[in-house]
Amino acid sequence: GVRLVGSEMCIRDRYKKYACLALLCIAVEAVLELMVPMIMADLIDNGVANGDTAYIYTKGLQMAGCAVLALILGIGSARFSALAGQGLGANIRQAEYEKLQSYSFANIDHFRVSSLVTRLTSDVTNIQNSVSTGMRPFGRSPVMLIFASSVAFTINRTLAFVFFVALPILAVLLIIIIMNVRPLYGRMQNAIDLVNRSIQENLTAIRVVKAYVRGDYEVAKFEEVNANLKKESEKAFGIAVLNMPAMQFVMYGTIISILFIGGHLINAGQLKIGELTSFLSYVLLILNSLMMMSNVFLMMTRSLASASRIVEVLDEKIDITDEQAEDISVKKGSIEFDHVWFKYKKEAKEYVLSDVSFNIEAGQTIGIIGQTGSAKTTLVSLIPRLYDATKGTVRIDGIDVKKYPMRHLRDAIAVVLQKNTLFSGSLLSNLYWGNENASMEEINEACHIACVDEFLDRLPQGYDTDMGQGGVNVSGGQKQRICIARAILKKPKVLILDDSTSAVDTATEAKIREGLAKKLPDMTKIVIAQRISSVKHADQIIILDRGKVAAIGTHETLLANNRIYQEIYESQKEGVDL
């Protein structure tokens, strides 16, 4: 496996194999390249100097053979490095995406969506590129350094010491550059987050932007974050680009020193021309490798900044797990809230829900009503464990919801949220989200209950009509009815309608209510609504007021005895048949 700054990342065996093959090719290629100067020195000192043509041809063929083999191995190493890098990138993305699927709403609230997108794309690409392009110099440099240094000492120790003086200078320059550029890379990735957020928000709310004629404002807002990204990028790369000139300055200084000292040694008869040529070849190989290695360290510095952001996603502690789960499933659908308290963050001072207690029998229809901000949606979110209660217990069929495996629990509960979501694709494919094995008979039945059949014939291609991105090809009321049909297809024990008929006229809403009561009498139904007409026929109505249960009763009882219900009723009754 691969360890990514503390988080275990698994690489499939074939990618491990590619990485090993790449390193093997790189090492052998480096050895072959290092043999060429040795052969060349021998050719000059023994072949050319003595005028031995046969010897020159033999050594020339040896050099050509080394060059061809090095070329083949170089191509192989590039291929295997790319496969290893792409494989690692794919696995990191997969690991991140799978982790995100296990996030609770509370976990998701810790990140912005745009930031998560960046961590799945740009940050992974940085790591991927550092592996794909960095493996070659990273593998070559140690081999080159050890082998060439040994040969350099063998050729001439005096010149070798000149070369080794340059190494600490190169190291110090690289450390200074890395220390300055590393925090800037982190800021640059955060700036990319802001750009992605601006784009995402604009495209998601493009209709609102058009309706309010705020295009110029959005352009100005984007210009600001784009300029910030440009500024942060210029800072980071402005320091990073100093790497190459600094390395070249040291390299050329080293070469000049070697030529100067080598010339004196040749004049003194202590060094041959072929040996100096060979020595310079090794020095150039080593220094070029070290320059490439410095670029690898810069890439790694950027990839480490990205890796730390990815690790934040992978190391996020999932607060809703199956630790207490047993092998059980929901049988009936009765619900009990037992002194439940809830707040979104542990450090928050005030509770969103305070000491909530009530019972719902299996098959009952329960209405929940209250002013905006009274925590109605939060209340029902605790039933399928989208959030967990801070204190108290939520039970289904008398069993704590934490005892149910989450998959079984959520399979038994269907939620039609306030913000209805349809996916790109046909109407039929969206309905299959509720039950991928549903028959057409079951689909027709669900559509009849949800009154989808009333507009189905008017759709251009019926069930095959494309919904468009987010369901833009149907109206708000039609979208709500499709979402209700999708929930019915799930055949849940508990159906939660969270203000999901707000865009439907009262006559159609009444038909849906009657259809649910007649066709699905054993299903527990919880209806959150703003309109009293939506809940007046419920077996019990729960009134929430600032996160507390203000009253529970039937429409008649509450109308007679509860002030909050009376006020809501009075505010809605004018011109409406309640």
Question: What is each of the regions a protein language model found here?
Answer:
Residues 1-6, 11:
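Single conserved hydrophobic/aromatic residue that forms the stacking wall/gate
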Residues 9-10, 120, 293, 416, ...:
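Hydrophobic beta-strand positions within the nucleotide-binding domains of ABC ATPases
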Residues 16-17, 102-106, 122-131, 135, ...:
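An intracellular "coupling" helix at the cytosolic face of ABC transporter transmembrane type-1 domains
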Residues 19-76, 80, 153-158, 269-273:
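Transmembrane helix-loop-helix hairpins at lipid-water interfaces of multipass membrane proteins
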Residues 24, 32, 36, 73, ...:
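Hydrophobic alpha-helical transmembrane segments of ABC transporter permease domains
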Residues 50-51, 86, 94-118, 122-124, ...:
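Short intracellular "coupling" helices and adjacent cytoplasmic loop segments at the cytosolic face
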Residues 52-58, 151-165, 235-309, 313-314:
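Helix-loop-helix
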Residues 328-578:
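ABC-type nucleotide-binding domain
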